[in-house]
Amino acid sequence: MKVLITGTSQGIGKAIAEHFLNHSHTVIGIDRQASGIIHENYTHYQCDVRDYKHLPDISDIEVLINNAGTQNEQDIDTNLKALIHITETYGIQEHIHSILNIGSASAHTGAEFPEYCASKGGVLAYTKNVAMRIAKYGATCNSLDPGGVLTPLRKWATPEEIAEWAYFLTMVNTFCTGQCILVDGGESINYNFVWKD
């Protein structure tokens, strides 16, 4: 399949791209940084997902994975607005098979920085919107929401673990759609209730 992934130069995005390449898919990456992947089936576009005028002209994407994200003053612009633009540009079309948004456990818990958790909360709502709109193509759209703190399992998720989830949700799954899948090692169930003073 023809797979477009944003944020592929490092971390989760790079691991996802490599996982798809290892399964013989054609992968296109978009990232502000130079490519960290050398593979005959990989094409890299170095540009900012927020720079709408300079995004590459790519057609007939079958799998779209919105991974590009940040934790700084550009949270809303990168994590939400650019994700929406990328999806509307490349994902809402008849050739689409699956769209996956990389969210965050923070969207469920409200933890971390205000703008960050708000941007990821927007991703959850938008995921459901897209799932309804691409159902007519027989396509799915879900959000994969990793945790980012020390969890009850007392370990961190690796980028490779998240890549396996991404592959399952886009390539194996055909029926789960509009869902926000928490892969957080129990972060969201490690809830500490606080009584009012």
Q: Where are the regions that the model predicts?
A:
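C-terminal substrate-recognition "lid" of short-chain dehydrogenase/reductases
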Residues: P159-V183, S188-I189
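Conserved active-site helix of classical SDR/Rossmann-fold NAD(P)-dependent CH-OH oxidoreductases
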Residues: E18, I84, G121-K128, M132, ...
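Catalytic loop of short-chain dehydrogenase/reductase
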Residues: S98-G122, T127-K136, G148-V149
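Short, small/polar-rich loop/turn modules that mediate ligand/substrate recognition or access, typified
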Residues: A135, T140, C176-Q179
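Conserved NAD(P)H cofactor-binding loop of Rossmann-fold oxidoreductase domains
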Residues: N67-N72, G186
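N-terminal Rossmann NAD(P)H-binding glycine-rich loop of SDR-like oxidoreductase domains
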Residues: S9, A17
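Conserved SDR Rossmann-fold cofactor-binding beta-strand/turn motif
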Residues: T140-L150, L182-D184
